[in-house]
């Protein structure tokens, strides 16, 4: 059975672990536990063929900046996550996360993933953002950044309601299986 390795990166507390747990177990975790490193595996059927989708969770906290890249070799696709209600996590996609993955895995495809879309219309969240003269990140802003950074696509979801959740992983699988241009090997390699 062919395995697809999918690594999830992004700032701490943007919902990376919730995204994976909600997708793999259909349950939303109730408390926040910062991740050091975890992985999950699910079997998916693509065109009648079974594939193992290996999902690798990473810690977004800076303390793990040297440890995190150890999970990057052999990656087929990255999910670069930010919370749509955390403008700083959106900024860090461009400032930190895409530079980090492209430094280690230049040709590996990645999706830009907006998380926590259920909070986009929540009053307390909007008030908190307004106090700092901020607004939630829009779908259009996500699509624009994805294009600018050459992501395969921009997708967004809520791990809580599961809206858009399956689509995130369907798109990740498609990105990993897209036939590469003949001159490029797309799997991440460390030299």
Swiss-Prot record:
Propeptide residues, chain positions: 189-191
Modified residues annotated as Cysteine methyl ester in this record: 188
GO biological process: actin cytoskeleton organization; actin filament organization; actin filament polymerization; axon extension; axon guidance; axonogenesis; border follicle cell migration; branch fusion, open tracheal system
InterPro entries registered for this protein in UniProt: Cdc42, P-loop_NTPase, Small_GTP-bd, Small_GTPase, Small_GTPase_Rho
Outcome of mutating residue 12 to V: Enhances interaction with mbt. Coexpression with mbt slightly reduced the substrate phosphorylation ability of mbt
Catalyzed reactions: GTP + H2O = GDP + phosphate + H(+)
Keywords associated with the record: Cell junction, Cell membrane, Developmental protein, GTP-binding, Hydrolase, Lipoprotein, Membrane, Methylation, Nucleotide-binding, Prenylation
GO molecular function annotations of the record: G protein activity; GTP binding; GTPase activating protein binding; GTPase activity; protein kinase binding
Its EC number(s): 3.6.5.2
Lipidation (S-geranylgeranyl cysteine): 188
Motif segment (Effector region): 32-40
Domain of life: Eukaryota
Residues at which GTP binds: 10-17, 57-61, 115-118
Topology versus the membrane: Lipid-anchor
Top EC class for this record: hydrolase
Subcellular location: Cell junction, Adherens junction; Cell membrane
Quaternary structure note: Interacts with Frl (via GBD/FH3 domain); the interaction is stronger with the GTP bound form of Cdc42. The GTP-bound but not the GDP-bound form interacts with mbt and gek. When GTP-bound, interacts with Pak.
Protein name per the record: Cdc42 homolog
Gene source species: Drosophila melanogaster
GN (gene name): Cdc42
């Amino acid at each position: 059975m062919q395995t697809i390795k999918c690594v999830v990166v992004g700032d701490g507390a943007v919902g990376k672990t919730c995204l994976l747990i909600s997708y793999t177990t259909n349950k939303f975790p109730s408390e926040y536990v910062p991740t050091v490193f975890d992985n999950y595996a699910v079997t998916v059927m693509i065109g009648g063929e079974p594939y193992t989708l290996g999902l690798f969770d990473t810690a977004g906290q800076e303390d793990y900046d040297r440890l995190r890249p150890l999970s990057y070799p052999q990656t087929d696709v990255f999910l670069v996550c930010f919370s749509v209600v955390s403008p700083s996590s959106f900024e860090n996609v461009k400032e930190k996360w895409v530079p980090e993955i492209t430094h280690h895995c230049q040709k590996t495809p990645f999706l830009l993933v907006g998380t926590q879309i259920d909070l986009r219309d929540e009053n307390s969240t909007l008030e908190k953002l307004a106090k700092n003269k901020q607004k939630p990140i829009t779908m259009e802003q996500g699509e624009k950044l994805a294009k600018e950074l050459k992501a395969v696509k921009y997708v967004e979801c809520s791990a809580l309601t599961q809206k858009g959740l399956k689509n995130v992983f369907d798109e990740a699988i498609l990105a990993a299986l897209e036939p590469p241009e003949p001159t490029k090997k797309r799997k991440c390699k460390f030299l």
